[in-house]
UniProtKB/Swiss-Prot annotation:
Gene name tied to this protein: rnf141
Keywords: Metal-binding, Zinc, Zinc-finger
InterPro entries xref list: RING-HC_RNF141, RNF141-like, Znf_RING, Znf_RING/FYVE/PHD, Znf_RING_CS
Annotated protein name in UniProt: RING finger protein 141
Zinc finger (RING-type): 147-184
Any GO MF annotation of the entry: ubiquitin-protein transferase activity
GO biological processes: protein autoubiquitination
């Protein structure tokens, strides 16, 4: 006989899984105008956090990536670290919508605490480079692309709905169903799924380790 999860068991669900479910729900309900508003908000918030510092972050929607009806799948957000003194780009990384939403929640949550405590000046001191710190967070988010089923294996494949899976889980699932196991969207043909792009090469990594922000996420070159 099957058993139902008790309320106590539900409360013991891994925090990581609960956070993932919330992010998936958030991305599902997000409208295009709200998305653009969040991009603008991050530019404003990070500018305030980095006030008085030599570097700042700039968030932009990659041109053309949001032009289709399936913009949530295709859209890419470019995060660039810029030196205010000479305008030089020091690092540039690219995120998908899911990764951007995670970063948005992280930054706005910390900013709310800083601003409400009236310690914005301390938070933007010369001792802590906000731009480099948040570029490091972008690296963490884009490096930890995980399987939506087991939340452990590295994602090898992504579906049109933007949910990603490791090869082991997707092999088990595809033999039983043609729907995404997370959102249940139907996948009608094999060519509707895509193999994840390879991780940065050794040469790429060597170029980025010179600076914390230079190791942030997937390399992006305009």
């Amino acid at each position: 006989m099957g058993q139902q999860l008790s309320g106590q068991a539900v409360t013991r669900l891994p925090e990581k899984l609960i956070k993932h479910v919330g992010l998936v729900r958030d991305s599902g309900y997000l409208t295009y105008d709200e998305f653009l508003g969040r991009v603008a908000e991050l530019n404003d918030v990070t500018a305030k956090l980095a006030s008085g510092q030599k570097k700042h972050l700039l968030f932009e929607v990659q041109p053309g990536s949001d032009s289709s009806a399936l913009w949530k799948v295709a859209v890419r957000i470019v995060c660039t670290k810029i030196n205010k003194e000479d305008g030089m780009v020091e690092a540039s990384r690219i995120m998908n919508l899911y990764q951007f939403i995670q970063l948005y929640k992280d930054i706005t949550s910390q900013a709310a605490e800083v601003f409400s405590s009236n310690v914005a000046a301390e938070g933007s001191s010369e001792d802590t480079c906000q731009a480099s710190m948040w570029m490091g967070r972008v690296k963490q988010l884009t490096d930890e692309e995980e399987c939506c089923i087991c939340m452990d294996g590295k994602a090898d494949l992504i579906l049109p709905c933007a949910h990603s899976f490791c090869q082991k889980c997707i092999d088990k699932w595809s033999g039983q169903s043609r729907n995404c196991p997370v959102c249940r969207i139907q996948v009608t043909a094999a060519n509707e799924s895509w193999v994840m792009s390879d991780a940065p090469t050794g040469e790429d990594v060597a170029g980025y380790i010179l600076n914390l922000a230079d190791e942030a996420g997937h390399p992006h070159r305009p």
